[in-house]
């Protein structure tokens, strides 16, 4: 760990959040759980109002979408995952329909404010850079546009390269947490989903190029492709 980094507690870091702020969370396995928990404690204490929370899918719980935080937190999702779907349907969260490739434009164009970016990063290298690991997507643009950037430094975050590498100078507050990253959660497909998977797989010819989405149906289709040949992949994600 870089000895030049000054760490603060999660509770200390989230004090920078003000009522009316727009917050971005890094996504999927990189969701900054320790910061989310600290932010919810501020909500429980009645210290915040009308805070907007934005992110793509996150693994794990999304407590800020709970009905008890009505008027305190409101989640506007770029992707409606299983952990927020019921609360979106109930009206305690909302969905911004947008292509994944366009999410960064929301922040960079100013169409969507970003006051605080809460992210999770790798430990720093000898050059003073950390990696965004499993979550670049809209997170890089959020970091560039935010008033304040809070980073959880976690030794379990993998060091991915390219646009994922950012200098320590882009981060305002550092919080240390070595919790194991949240894995992807997959349920066994239902009989209906299996049937859909079989029907779809029968339409796919050998040599086809695949673009896969996220969820039970794409996984059910993939499970039926074991005997296909020369399949290509051109996709933003691909499940196990």
Q: Predicted segments — roles?
A:
Residues 1-240:
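Conserved alpha/beta enzyme-core scaffold
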């Amino acid at each position: 760990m870089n000895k030049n980094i000054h760490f603060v507690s999660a509770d200390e870091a989230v004090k920078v959040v003000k009522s009316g702020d727009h917050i971005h969370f890094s996504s999927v396995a990189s969701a900054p759980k320790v910061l989310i928990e600290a932010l919810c404690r501020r909500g429980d204490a009645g210290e915040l109002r009308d805070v907007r929370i934005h992110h793509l899918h996150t693994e794990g719980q999304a407590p800020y979408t709970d009905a008890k935080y009505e008027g305190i937190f409101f989640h506007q999702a770029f992707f409606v995952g299983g952990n927020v779907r019921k609360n979106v349907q109930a009206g305690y969260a909302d969905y911004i329909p947008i292509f994944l490739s366009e999410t960064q434009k929301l922040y960079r164009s100013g169409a969507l404010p970003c006051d605080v970016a809460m992210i999770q990063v790798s430990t720093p290298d000898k050059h003073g850079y950390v990696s965004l690991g499993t979550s670049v997507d809209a997170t890089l643009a959020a970091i560039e546009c935010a008033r304040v950037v809070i980073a959880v430094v976690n030794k379990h975050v993998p060091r991915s390269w390219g646009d994922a590498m950012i200098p320590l100078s882009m981060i305002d507050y550092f919080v240390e947490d070595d919790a194991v990253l949240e894995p992807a959660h997959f349920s066994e497909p239902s009989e209906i989903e299996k049937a859909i998977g079989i029907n779809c797989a029968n339409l796919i010819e050998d040599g086809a190029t695949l673009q896969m989405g996220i969820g039970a149906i794409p996984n059910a289709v993939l499970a039926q492709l074991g005997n296909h040949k020369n399949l290509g992949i051109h996709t933003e994600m691909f499940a196990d």
